[in-house]
Amino acid sequence: MNNGFDTVYYLNFGAPSPAASVELAVQYAAAGCRHLQLDLPTQDPYLEHDIIRDRMLQSLSAFPSLGVYLDAICALHMRLAEVKLELTVYEDTLREIGFSRFFDFCAQAGIRYVAYLPQRQGADEALGAKLEAGGLHLLEAVPFHLPAGQVARAVATGRPIQLMMQSIGG
């Protein structure tokens, strides 16, 4: 970390397989990566570009049990304990895993920071509060073009801020 900033590398976890994702993370670490943001696949990757959306859906088709991803991420943490992990999780994936299991998984995988993405329809912001009550820290996302209102709101939360590219997918 330098002056409060970390370069965070993104890894679309699970594509082409959870095991291949672990090996790719090992390569990232060998090249100097010390901070990875992983995502868990979702059936409704509405914020993702077509490429990531397709990779998530293909991954879930090949490996439908979310336990496979959780186990692989825990194995990754055991292998690369020096690499800080954070996680992006959509509401439907979180609900499928369940809070108790999710909290246990995050503790085992050394994950403290989570980008929680509520579903578009009927978004349940209370789930974000529940994640925080369970000891996790939410990342505050701000679009790359830095809209002033969103930047001010993100700064006011006191949360770590994640600069997001806007999806250009269809």
Say what each PLM segment does.
Residues 1-3, 29-30, 73-81, 104-108, ...:
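Acidic (Asp/Glu)-rich catalytic clusters
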Residues 79-119:
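Hydrophobic alpha-helical segments and helix pairs
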Residues 37, 114-115, 139-140, 162-164:
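Conserved beta-strand positions in the central sheet of alpha/beta enzyme cores
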Residues 6-21, 84-98, 139-146, 167-170:
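Active-site mouth loops of central-metabolism enzymes
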Residues 18, 42-54, 61-74, 94-100, ...:
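Active-site-adjacent beta->alpha loops and helix N-cap segments on the catalytic face
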Residues 34, 112, 159:
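Receiver (REC) domain switch/active-site residues of two-component response regulators
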Residues 154-170:
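Active-site rim beta-loop-alpha module in soluble metabolic enzymes
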